[in-house]
Amino acid sequence: VKTKAGSATKNIVEMNDGTVHGNLYGAALTDAASTGNADANEMTINGGTVSGTVYGSHNAGAGDAKGNTITIKGGSLHGIYGGFAAGTGVTTGNTVNLGDGEHSLAAGTTINGTIYGGNKANDADNTLNVNTNATAGNIANFDKLKFTLKDSTLNPANSVLRLTTGATNNLDWTKLDVDATGLTVTPKSYEAYRVNLMDNANGVSFTKGATNTYASSGAKQRTNGDLEYVIDTDNHTANAAQYVYFEALQFQNKQNAEFAAADGTKNEAWGGRTKVGNGVKNNTLTVTGGTLTQAAYGGLAENFTRDSAGNLNTAGNATENKLVLNAGANTLNAYGAQVRTKGGSAAENTVLLSGGTVTGSLYGGALTDAGATGSATANEITVKGGTVTGDVYGGFTNGSGATTGNIVNLGDGDHSLSTGTNIAGTIYGGNKADVTGNTLNVNTNATAGNIQNFGKLQFNLNSNALTQSTPMLRLSASGGTNNLDWRTLDVNAEKFNAPIKTYEAYNLVLMENIN
């Protein structure tokens, strides 16, 4: 339009094929003296080549270029502007859609330049909708970023938006959103379902102007039944090293998680896990093979969300989770549940060691943050077989809370331990001095390095699980066994039916420590 007073509004342009040797405009006011606006225009590019720049609207005058929409479905393109105002006008409220929300981009689609919401720094309501996998040089001047993830339009093996030219800056973390209602996710026991939303090897910054927009919330979360959706940067700061990612984890009611020989070697495996402080509850992981170089967890609780002051939130409990280690299992450490938050607790978690090898230590429930204020209580470990090279803890905390009411069972009460079963280290009711309610149940002949921090020792005699010629509990580590309470040592002989001779008493050594 070459008029000073006229406007260019509500025009529609669709490009299907061919080549534009120059720029492509949804609408244009070409007179520098123009006072009109170039608003609310629509453009759809299905294919073809544009050798110049794509403009939702271009205003050479003093007016605005706002409220325009560009939808890219295919083509070979360079720079893209939702709106461009050469004068004093604004370029706000523009929308660029990568994909139509129903289909992937056409094969061979390229965007070699930067996608701008508008050419002005005021980017209010400029929105980039990423509806499918796409690659561009960069993005700039967008107020809002929205990623729509659907099975029909997404290849999760590739980053949703890959940016290749320079760092991406001046984004607003509070206005990044993800719609995953059309996505089917199945987290594995050793990895979350993960999609990289943004991928820029030069970095992605959510410092908007001088404001760190990430600090007031940290990781974002959505909850869908037993699943949590986590949106975060790769280093949990405003300045991602390369990736902004979407993860799905099941934090509760995962009863059938498995890690087997076919899974090979991984760092970790878990039954249920949270990264945003949800309650990790009622999960079970069974390990039958493979190698875990860090740990196996029935439940694992973390929290990367932040409060309004930018501090990490402290919530995140783990309760009623279970870890089962069978023959073939091989892990460094093992936990009924581990809590890495400061305010969380670990309670009523269980470990069943039937076989396999723990080359580190075994924990019923553990709080690993040095500033942890919660407690590790009422956790239970049952040993039926296997080996532990390190120590065994019913409850453990690196912080200030209690480790009371925990139970360790040596044997299940009906059977002897599997051949070769051994605990080389010390068995602790808890690692704190308060031993209230910590109980060691010795149900069959067993060996360990030592025992410590138990309020009660219970020897349960079952003739079917007992060898008279061997002490029920043989302790082999150097140093004596101390701080036991004779008043709370007890023997239960309800299942004891060995014949008693007429000329001598039945003699059984309950506990032996030659040191």
Residue ranges and their predicted role:
Residues 1-8, 12-15, 20-24, 236-296, ...:
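N-terminal segments that cap or nucleate solenoid repeat domains
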Residues 2-4, 14-16, 21-31, 44-46, ...:
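Feature marks extracellular polysaccharide-active and adherence modules
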Residues 4, 10, 25, 42-45, ...:
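Intrinsically disordered, low-complexity segments used as extracellular stalks/linkers
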Residues 6-9, 36-39, 63-66, 89-93, ...:
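Short, solvent-exposed linear patches
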Residues 37-38, 90-96, 157-163, 267-270, ...:
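Short, polar loop/linker segments at the starts of domains and inter-domain junctions
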Residues 89, 103, 108-192, 399-404, ...:
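Extracellular beta-strand/loop-rich repeat segments of large surface/secreted proteins
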Residues 194, 199-263, 496-515:
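Outer-membrane translocation/initiation segment of Type V secreted surface proteins
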